[in-house]
Amino acid sequence: MLIMTGLELKNNTMRLLITCLFLWHLAAFAQYKTEIYVAKDGSGDFTSIQEAIDNTKSFPDKPITIFIKAGVYQEKVKVHAWNNNLTLKGENPENTIIRWDDHFKKINRARNSTFHTYTLLVQGDNFRAENLTIENFAGEVGQAVALSVEADRAVFVNCRMLGNQDTLYADGANSRQYYEDCYIEGTTDFIFGAATALFKNCVIHSKSNSFITAASTPEGRNFGFVFLDCELTAAPGVDKVYLGRPWRDFAKTAFINCEMGPHIRPEGWDNWSSPEREKTTLYAEFGNTGPGASNEKRVPWSHQLSKKQAKKYNMDKIFEPFLLPSMNLIPVEND
């Protein structure tokens, strides 16, 4: 007959307790919620978007969707790098609004203040947003980012990005981003950054005489910003807008089959007072229509593509080797 001492019994009890706790934690992690609801009126799981994000599983192996009920969510939101495979889904962009009012002078973090002014910052890969408005309502006070995206494989569908200067910071040297059926407005350089980004069927709205894009495409990248089947519009009285200027030496921006209003300047592009960048940037156009699309007076260092050259500006080639089918995020288009 085996007789345990008090010490042995205590040790066995402790081991059993530790084993039970370990199994409980495994079960808890295996059963994490993949659908979370946010509602201002308290009818959901959380009343704050950030609180909902902070309570999701880190590095989940299954996609997590946060459903956001209609309301104005006045908060600064950050999707951390460990919040991958996350979707934020609103009811519709007209009444599901995330807004904040940080700007360069308010943040006061020296020369890098711009990058801290975001309303929504996305760092987690495989991110998706639908039916949302993301707004920086600081006004015309200088740099004030509404949406900042550093993540790879980020998708925005039926969203509005509202602001003035630097509305959308599409950043990340290795970031690939897709925007479909979105509305993006601003004043100066309101779409800027280093990402490879495709804008499909979007409305790009200029609120003042200035510049739409300021790409900082890394050297060696085949694509930077590509606007496909987009509409370029402007506020009343706005009639002197450039398609873009190079934030860095190897900026790449292309407008393909877009409708351009009369606010687009005849020369189209600006060198940002750096003539040497005319040799290294790639600013391209093909098949555009409207009064702003005439290429007769375009700067000589821009590129009017042939039909053959324009064919490479399709989703497969832009995002290669973006694993589109497995992501179930974006339909693959073929020539």
Predicted regions and their residues:
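Bacterial Sec-dependent N-terminal signal peptides
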Residues: 1-33
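Sequence-level preference for short, compositionally simple segments enriched
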Residues: 31-335
